[in-house]
Amino acid sequence: MKERGLELSPEKTKITHIDEGFDFLGFNARKYGGKLLIKPAKKGIKSFLDDIRGTVKSMRAVKTENLIKYLNVKIQGWVNYYRHCVAKATFNYLDNSIFWIVWKWGKRRHQNRGASWVRKRYYTTLGLRKWCFYSKVKAGKQESRILLTLAQHTKIERHVKVRAEASPYDPDFKEYFIKREREKMRKKNDSRVI
């Protein structure tokens, strides 16, 4: 490494056993029972929930519609970053935590009202889900609803490894890389259509 002009910083370098795991770029890599799993790091989850709490507390007086729009952008961005790792349980935990944060927001906003009144005002039933945080939105004469995004509804997509022998410069693998690119574009377009 020294030939290339690279040095390891002792403060930033940590050598650890894979069974203990390590955090890197918001992910935690660790072996569980002989199988390597990459999950969102606990520090990243805590930081995200603290950010959501701070956002909700600072937006006490805003319209519900604006709060939902703001939270949806944050939730979707965070979830898209972690959608390629083992994150389903984390997404469920986030949804549960955000539910209680938003519930407290509604209760704090209407301190003289009961829980059932707050539920009727801010929550609706959608299919089998009985507690969907929502707001009515008026656009001209039409009225629609905006719902809080649930992290658990995001599809986990695993990274497909490139074949070891495949090279984009080898004409024999031209069709293979065209097919990979098509699949990548299809997934990208599918995620936009909701």
Regions found by a protein language model. Give the residues of each.
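Non-catalytic terminal/accessory segments
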Residues: 1-194
